[in-house]
Amino acid sequence: MSSSEISPYLSFRDSARQAMEFYQSVFGGDLGISTFEEYQVSEDPSEQDKVMHSRLVTDNGMVLMAADVPNRIDLIPGTNFSVSLSGEDEEQLHGYWDKLIVGGSADMPLEQAPWGDSFGMLTDRFGVSWMVNIAGPGGGEGPTSGAAPS
């Protein structure tokens, strides 16, 4: 039986790597980091070293994820977090998406992503930002579902 995971996802302006390395020094565990360049998500040369996704998994199972926000997107302090839903159960995760979006809005449609998974972002009717990642055929190595490549 596959399971889904819910985790906090933090957003930063050019400091995700430093923040996640700090959190790793506090909580321990394994930290995976992927850059914009690795996933080819930006053509802006100044963004290639930015963190597209990072995932810290502590020895006791806590999970914290983070990324740098692209330059074209505003980052408002105090709203720099989302909730990530990820896993392999496509029907279950689509069901969560369908319920969460009622009265809310899709910020990015739930569709095929560059890393092979299905990915989407929405804001629910209470203003909470959600990211949904459904593992593709490769087994969930996408940004919000598995350990990012280092």
Report each predicted region and the residues it spans.
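Vicinal oxygen chelate
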Residues: 2-6, 32-34, 52-57, 62-68, ...
